Regions:
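A generic transmembrane alpha-helix motif of multi-pass inner-membrane proteins
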Residues: 1-17, 207-258, 271-275, 300, ...
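Membrane-interface "cap" regions at the ends of multi-pass membrane proteins
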Residues: 16-71, 259, 301, 305
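Flexible loop linkers connecting adjacent transmembrane helices
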Residues: 23-50, 73-76, 86, 90, ...
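Membrane-interface helix-loop-helix modules in multi-pass membrane proteins
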Residues: 52-111, 122-126, 143, 148-159, ...
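Membrane-helix boundary/coupling elements in multi-pass transport proteins
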Residues: 68-75, 92-100, 104, 108-112, ...
Length: 574
């Protein structure tokens, strides 16, 4: 298969899905009926609830949901071949992930910008909400740990026998320097747009120009050669500040500017694919490698492993937390929900397909050292294969690594803010706001600074202490979040008298996938324990995996009961 043909077919399919299926869903739910004001306006507080222009919010939303997922997911699932991954990305994105993200955002804005947990409480039960929040919070802690470690490893200098390896560390130091300057530019951009009311076009042009200048400076001046552990601490301090800072100061402008890095990355990738249009070599990257694959991690089954590994490239539970956690509090108009949520998911599918194209060429050119090298190396090598572009490989590689790091950093502080919301929400009664709490203990628990500090300490400690030992659970846990998100929105739509049939198969399928995946993980880890070669990781995975299966079953029973017997109550938001 030629990579250009694969990309064009995929874009055409996704475009049709957006125009036809996405529009049908919007009509079924009554999106934008009556021109309702969104929570960003009715509950504006200048910190979390702040209306944002659609391009800025699209930048935040996409940068937050993308992270490393649409790159690492397809790379991990590529062991089964490019065809099954492509089919799942296209089908999953249109009928699963897009519906999930759009539904979560729409449900949240009809519930005053509340999270999926609060929607579960109002439409299912308080017990279901508490279970969901505990599960979501623990999953977010794992996300914070993993992304903090990824960012720190991207920045951290390489030491050999205690001596700094300058040559091996130069690119990392460049990425770190550019990232630091990028944060400062974002703050200036935020003040220019929201306080000085500088026109968006002028601000964007100056912002993009500043990013280019930052890259030029960072590639030639990079004085910070800190170790990975030092960067972990510094990243922890950064996300502590970022998650309690008003969104207009840092989160909105930085994510908006990050979106230009994404567009640059997509343009570079498309130039590489169009210009070089290499054919995928079936010998190194077959269309279909089989239903079972044996590798260093044992026997891998296409079902359910494919559907939990691709993750963000087709559907991801983390997206529902972003949609209902930060995006819904910044949505300016209901009509923006479809392009931002449904369109954002399909754009992520395009990135997943580009990743598949990169894998095929990376395996030919020898870029096989981890997800970052596979993606950046594959795309950069394609660009360098175009006549006249041979000298751009190193520049393109650095740009792509920087973009990858920027996405991880964006997802990291969004995840920290979401975890703070979850921690606070656990202690609140339905409909109660943190400012209303007078009780001493609960007042401490819902304090945003206390909630953030606890979250960061747990996340950074796990990141420094071996999150990889339980990372195997993340794929299944993330997809379980997606199944529960689908379940919650379907329950609300049923209670509100709206069509929820488009949720029934996706949520049932994802529940089946996650329960099977978790059961396989538990079985494999028990085998490791019985073999007598286990540290604490396998024990933790068995315990957590078993609890997640029980949680999935409890929430499934509650959800299906609600869907089967919807309650038309006056407090349900229509």
């Amino acid at each position: 298969m030629n990579t250009l043909v694969l990309l064009l077919i995929s874009i055409a399919v996704l475009f049709c899905g957006y125009v036809f299926y996405g529009s049908w869903i919007a009509r079924q739910w009554g999106v934008n009926e009556g021109n309702r004001p969104t929570p960003a306006h009715t509950m504006e507080d200048g910190v979390d609830y702040v209306p944002a222009k659609a391009p800025i919010l699209m930048g935040h939303h996409f940068s937050s949901i993308a992270g490393a997922g649409p790159i690492t997911g397809p790379i991990g699932a590529a062991m089964f071949g490019w065809l099954p991954v492509t089919l799942w990305v296209l089908i999953g994105g249109i009928f699963f992930g897009g519906v999930h993200d759009f539904g979560a955002l729409f449900a949240s804005i009809r519930h005053q910008g509340k999270s999926i947990g609060e929607i579960i409480s109002l439409n299912m039960s308080k017990k279901a909400k508490q279970l969901f929040i505990i599960f979501s919070y623990l999953t977010l802690i794992l996300v914070v740990a993993a992304f903090a470690a990824i960012v720190a490893s991207t920045f951290g200098a390489t030491y050999k026998d205690g001596v700094l390896d300058m040559a091996a560390s130069a690119t990392k130091a460049s990425v770190a320097m550019v990232s630091i300057m990028f944060i400062l530019i974002a703050i200036i951009f935020g003040f220019a747009v929201y306080r000085r009311h500088t026109p968006m076009v002028i601000s964007s042009i100056l912002g993009v120009g500043a990013i280019v200048l930052c890259m030029a400076i960072g590639m030639n001046f990079h004085p910070f050669y800190f170790s990975m552990n030092t960067w972990m601490v510094l990243v922890g301090i950064y996300i502590t500040i970022a998650s309690v800072t008003p969104v207009w100061i840092l989160l909105q402008p930085r994510d908006y500017l990050s979106s230009f890095l994404l567009y640059a990355m997509l343009i570079v990738a498309i130039i590489g694919i169009v210009g070089a249009h290499p054919t995928i070599d079936e010998k190194v990257f077959p269309a279909f490698a089989g239903f079972t694959i044996n590798n260093a991690n044992g026997t891998q089954f296409l079902f359910p492993i494919l559907f939990t590994t691709v993750a963000c490239g087709a559907i991801s539970g983390f997206h529902s937390l972003v949609s209902s956690g930060t995006t819904s509090k910044q949505l300016d108009k209901e009509s923006d929900a479809k392009p931002i949520a449904y369109g954002g998911m399909l754009l992520e599918c395009v990135l997943a397909i580009i990743t598949l194209c990169a894998i095929g060429y990376a395996r030919v050119t020898g870029h096989t050292h981890g997800a970052t090298d596979i993606f950046a190396g594959g795309i950069a090598a394609m660009v360098a294969a175009i006549p006249g572009f041979e000298g751009l490989k190193n520049i393109m590689y650095t740009l792509l690594v920087l973009t990858y790091s920027a996405f991880c950093l964006t997802s990291l502080d969004t995840a920290t803010r979401l975890a703070r919301f979850m921690f606070q929400e656990f202690w609140l009664e339905p409909g109660e706001n943190p400012k209303d709490v007078k009780d001493g203990f609960r007042k401490l628990m819902v304090n945003p600074y206390f909630a953030t500090i606890i979250t960061v300490i747990l996340g950074i400690s796990l990141g420094m202490g071996g999150f990889a030992k339980i990372w195997g659970l993340f794929g299944a846990a993330n997809q379980l979040l997606a199944a529960i998100g689908l379940l919650a929105v379907a329950a609300w739509l049923g209670n509100a008298g709206k069509n929820n049939k488009m949720f029934l198969f996706p949520m049932s399928f994802m529940l089946l996938v996650t329960i099977c995946s978790l059961s396989l993980i538990v079985k494999n880890q028990i085998g490791i324990i019985m073999a007598g070669a286990a540290g604490w990781g396998p024990y933790a995975q068995v315990i957590i995996g078993s609890l997640l299966v029980i949680l999935a079953l409890i929430l499934a029973v509650e959800g299906y009961r609600t869907i089967a017997h919807p309650r038309k109550e006056t407090e349900i938001n229509h």
